[in-house]
């Protein structure tokens, strides 16, 4: 299989007054091994006949050992390291803020570029294992009414390097370099952070290939789950390109209600969504789809809704995650009573569907499901307020001088 790589597309120009715009350094962390081989060959960095070996060496340094400086790649020739540093980078984005919940959940606010921030969350489990919830976009276009992220307008897609960087930063903080395959703290990846992954499938697929590569981080694709609100035309491509586990952000059993909770449903209604799920590549009892269902008091939590859910997903190898609603500033929704959640789950269990109730984690640091929202908007709003105040101050100064 041949791989082509448009290096100019991956490194957008940066403006420079009075001359040609210099090219930004390409972050090699966002290249699959095949893409890395092409980059080294096309740039002329790798010695003749050694490009494949160099690609594997550099990949292992980035993703097995977690280095952020070419100078530390001691089994790469010194001259080659110098040429790499002239053209590429393996640096991390800036961690603006790190928070740790009383339950051990960790949240990082990561600045990918000026004004471009995302949140990433590590959720520890009962044992050593834990899941990392990564973002695929800055903001979101879907406007799900119960989701805090949906109140932030989409800024842009994240690149594969920016998605992978979230995993690298978590491993930095958890002190999990080198990437041992056993007894690891970070054992699962879930694309359930900010954004709709299927609206950024190319970069998401590359990131999954990098994260799952056994020469590096080596997290099995069966431990990587991609959650979508239901971009039906991309479901088959997701399965074919990534072999990742599928999760559907469902939350309603009829189109009228789902149109309100998940407006994307107006474009891809439940009948189309269920057909797409049934056709998902690799779906089986061993590779079940997960339906996510947020429990909203008086909205979607009745016994009748539970029975309708059983009917809706009949014949699909599935489990249902019942998610107690996590409040956020400004929402009108309220979490279902615990008794109502348990009664809902009992109906699903009786029908043969596993329906665990997700334990709320990280609520005290707004790191729980549906609570993520970057500080980008706040930063931009603050900057605008400062500019306005400065402008007003300038007007007042002018007025004072005129009066004098």
Swiss-Prot record:
What EC number(s) would the UniProt record show?
A: 2.1.1.192
Residues engaged in binding S-adenosyl-L-methionine: 195-196, 227, 249-251, 326
Q: Name the domain of life this protein comes from.
A: Bacteria
GO cellular component, alphabetical, reads: cytoplasm
**Where is [4Fe-4S] cluster bound in this sequence?**
140, 144, 147
Record-linked Pfam families: Radical_SAM, RlmN_N
Q: Where is the active site?
A: 119, 369
Which residues are connected by disulfide bridges in this protein?
Answer: 133-369
Instruction: Name the UniProt key words of this record, in alphabetical order.
Output: 4Fe-4S, Cytoplasm, Disulfide bond, Iron, Iron-sulfur, Metal-binding, Methyltransferase, rRNA processing, S-adenosyl-L-methionine, Transferase, tRNA processing
In the record, the note on similarity to other proteins reads: Belongs to the radical SAM superfamily. RlmN family.
Q: Anything else the record notes?
A: Reaction proceeds by a ping-pong mechanism involving intermediate methylation of a conserved cysteine residue.
Q: What's the protein name?
A: Dual-specificity RNA methyltransferase RlmN
Query: Organism classification, top ranks?
Result: Bacteria, Pseudomonadati, Pseudomonadota, Alphaproteobacteria, Caulobacterales
